Structures are given as C-alpha cells and as structure tokens.
A protein has these predicted regions:
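N-terminal strand-loop-strand
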Residues: 1-35, 143-148
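Conserved Nudix-box catalytic region and its N-terminal flanking loop in Nudix hydrolases
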Residues: 18-61, 157-164
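Nudix hydrolase/Nudix homology domain
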Residues: 31-32, 98-153, 162
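Active-site-proximal alpha-helix that buttresses catalytic centers in soluble enzyme cores
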Residues: 38, 139-225, 254, 263-264, ...
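Unchanged
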Residues: 40-63, 71-125
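Generic beta-sheet signal
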Residues: 142-144, 240-251
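Acidic, low-complexity terminal tails and accessory targeting/binding regions
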Residues: 172, 176-188, 210, 220-242, ...
C-alpha cells in the first residue's frame, strides 16, 4: 500500500516599514531555496506542523492566518523502490518574534519582497504558493468561527437543553481546539449562551486569562428571528480588530457564512450536497479586510477546517 507523505509549511511574512517581505530558506542538503516546511510529526495537525517547522527552520514564532494552497509531487520511497506521493499544505503566517540561526537543515535565510522572492525560489510549486499569498493583502483581520464540540444526543438529556454539557468526545475536541486555535493568536472569546458552546472555547480564553463573553445573537434562538442582525453583529466583531474566537451552533453557522460570502462575493468551498459545512468541533477561518471610515469589514477569504484533530487539509475558498 502506498503511504502518502504529509507535510506543512508557510509563507512567513513581516513588514519592513510599509514593505511586505517573505522568508526563504536555503537547504544545503538539496541545494535549493524554498519556503519553510517539513513533515508532520505523529498525531500532529497541519496547522501545528506549519508553526513548528517555521520555528525550527527560521527561528521565528509565527501566527497563522489564511490557508493558501496544497502542493503535491512524488518523492523517493523509503524502501528505495519507486516513489510515493508527498503533499504540503501552506498557510500565511506572520513573524512576531525570533531570530535566525543557521542549523543542519537550513544554513541561510533571506527576507525578500515577493517579486524578488519569486525569482529566487527553486521549485515551481513554491512559486505557485507565493502567488496565492500575494492575491490578498497582509494585515487582515481573522475571525475564528467555531461550531461547538460534541454534546451527546438531545433526546438523551432530560435537563434544560441550554445546560447540556460536552460529552467525552466533545471534551477531546475542545482540547484539540484549544491547541490549534492558539496558533492563530486569538485575543478574545465570544460564545452563544449555551453551556456546550462556552465549554468548547473556555480553554482558549483561559490561556490568556480572559472570560468567555455571551453573544445571544449567535445562538439559534437569537439568530433566526432576524439573521440580518446576526450578520451585522459578526461584522461588528470583525470591525473591532484583533483575532476573535466566536463559538456558535450548527443551525447558525452555515447561514451566517453563506450570507457573508454572498454579500462580499467570496466563493465557498464545495461540500456534499452543496451545503456549507459545519461539523461539530469544526471551525472557519474568516479573513476580513479591516473597516474604513466609509465601509464595514469585507470578507476576502473563508477556509473550513473540519476538525482540530489530525485531519485532511482545509477547504479553501
């Protein structure tokens, strides 16, 4: 059986004054210039691997943004017979701290403007990823829209449904979300006033000593009397800047994401039955252009992550 090699990486960027620069690394083993990337460790998600590999190869701590692309190409099999497919998933990632030090894998790092970087990159696949990065500006606002984790069956719960807690499986999902959402640099946490929603993201808030703020418009009962108000509320949250986490319900998220995408002309990833996906424990990374004096935030990209547990790459808009 052919075993696919999974890897992840990032277009690591920074601002030098008003100029965007991206990091390229030189690997002496291969004699090439590439984007930082590497194989997934066992039990690791692509997001976790991307951040770890950036840190190991460049010395920089990074905050993830939008998903960019997947590349695929054959590599020699470990058995020495033939090749196996290798896939690499890439994110945009902002460098927030660190310093490069040469190591066995990478002996040089260059910060270049994208046009110059494109001429230096060795592999055409890396050029394609860099061009995907350049399709949108940097400095976007990220909203992490989460569906609550598993909470058992409603029919099996005899109490107030608002107080239905996470199941054991849901607790595992929440723990995974805590790890993965942290990679995007969240700075506040909002949730529909349902225990299962609050429990799903409580750990995220706890990591930066914050409280989970209740948002009734993101519950099913609060959203559906007037969905326009719910959309406006999410835009207001995005307009406040930073990186908010918003935990909502399965009866809200598909309509909310669809409404934003229709409003701003963003094509959503295809799903089974063409419904907007929203599995329990999944999340959307919504990338907005910040508001101006005349305009509200504008949705520019929407990436769906079906799970914070090790899983396939997200679907890209």
């Amino acid at each position: 059986m052919t075993q696919e090699v999974r890897a992840a990486g990032a277009v690591l960027w920074r601002l030098a004054g008003r100029v965007t620069e991206v990091a390229l690394v030189h690997r002496p083993r291969y004699g090439d210039w590439s984007l930082p990337k590497g194989k997934l460790d066992p039990g690791e998600t692509i997001a976790e691997a991307a951040v770890r590999e950036v840190r190991e190869e460049t010395g920089f701590t990074a905050i993830l943004g939008r998903y960019l692309a997947r590349t695929a190409y054959p590599v020699p099999s470990r058995t020495g017979s033939g090749t196996v497919p290798k896939t690499v998933d890439y994110f945009a990632a902002e460098a927030v701290s660190g310093e490069f030090a040469a190591n066995d894998e990478v002996d040089e790092l260059r910060w270049l403007e994208p046009a110059a970087a494109e001429k230096v990159l060795t592999r055409p696949e890396d050029v394609r990823v860099l061009r995907a990065f350049c399709e949108l500006p940097v400095g976007l606002t990220t909203v992490l829209l989460v569906r609550h984790a598993k909470a058992g069956k409603r029919d099996d719960w005899s109490g107030d449904d608002d107080l239905r807690p996470l199941s054991e499986a849901g607790q595992r999902q929440a723990a995974a979300l805590r790890r993965v959402l942290a990679l995007f640099g969240p700075d506040r946490v909002l949730a529909a006033p349902r225990l299962r929603c609050v429990q799903t993201v409580h750990g995220v808030a706890e990591d930066f000593a914050a409280e989970v703020r209740h948002e009734p418009l993101f519950s099913e009962e609060g959203y559906w009397p007037d969905p326009v108000l719910g959309v406006a509320r999410l835009l207001a949250v995005a307009g406040d800047g930073g990186t908010p986490v918003v935990c909502s319900q399965g009866g809200v998220i598909p309509d909310l994401v669809s409404a934003l995408a229709d409003r701003d002309g963003v094509e959503l990833p295809a799903a089974r039955g063409r419904a907007v996906p929203s599995k329990k424990g999944s999340f959307w990374v919504l990338s907005f252009r910040p508001p101006t004096a005349e305009e509200a935030p504008l949705l520019l990209a929407a990436d769906y992550h079906p799970s914070a547990l090790p899983a396939p790459s997200p679907s890209r808009s």
